[in-house]
Curated annotation (Swiss-Prot):
Cross-referenced InterPro entries: Ribosomal_bL20, RIBOSOMAL_L20_CS, Ribosomal_protein_bL20_C
Keyword field contains Magnesium: no
Keyword Ribosomal protein: yes
Family indicated by similarity: Belongs to the bacterial ribosomal protein bL20 family.
Keywords: Ribonucleoprotein, Ribosomal protein, RNA-binding, rRNA-binding
Protein name: Large ribosomal subunit protein bL20
Coiled-coil parts of chain: none
Superkingdom: Bacteria
GO function term, MF aspect, one: rRNA binding
Organism name: Rhodococcus opacus (strain B4)
Upper taxonomic lineage: Bacteria, Bacillati, Actinomycetota, Actinomycetes, Mycobacteriales
Length: 129
């Protein structure tokens, strides 16, 4: 069987790992074994957090919408319910952007949502009809 020399491939593999881990602290950027292990963890975290980012942004949008809705005397869940009843389809991302950048347009949507809700739902929590 012929002898297989792997020096070039091994050096290329090591160099690529060390180049990818160039920003890490300490041994993790200088020693191949530590760098390889850290690279595995880094890619795992990146994969996980790309998915977590979607939920994080949704939470941020809901928080912004709720704050703006409460400034207009309605809660988040009643606003969403009213928009559904009024058959206004606007996603949370755009609704949050409206709440932050264009308060008048957001107030108009809130008015439409309030009008679509049943009358007893608009009453404050303490005054049930």
């Amino acid at each position: 069987m012929a002898r297989v020399k792997r020096a070039v491939n091994a050096q290329k593999k090591r160099r690529s790992i060390l180049e990818a881990s160039s920003g890490y602290r300490g041994q993790r950027s200088r020693l191949y074994r530590k760098a390889k292990e850290q690279q595995l963890h880094s890619l795992t975290y990146a994969y996980r957090d790309r998915r977590a980012r979607k939920g994080d942004f949704r939470k941020l949008w809901i928080t912004r919408i709720n704050a703006a809705a409460r400034a207009n005397d309605i809660t988040y869940n009643r606003l969403i319910q009213g928009l559904r009843l009024a058959e206004i389809e606007v996603d949370r991302k755009n609704l949050a952007e409206l709440a932050v950048s264009d308060a008048a347009a957001f107030a108009g949507l809130v008015a439409l949502a309030k009008a679509a809700l049943p009358a007893d739902v608009n009453a404050p929590a303490g005054e049930a009809a």
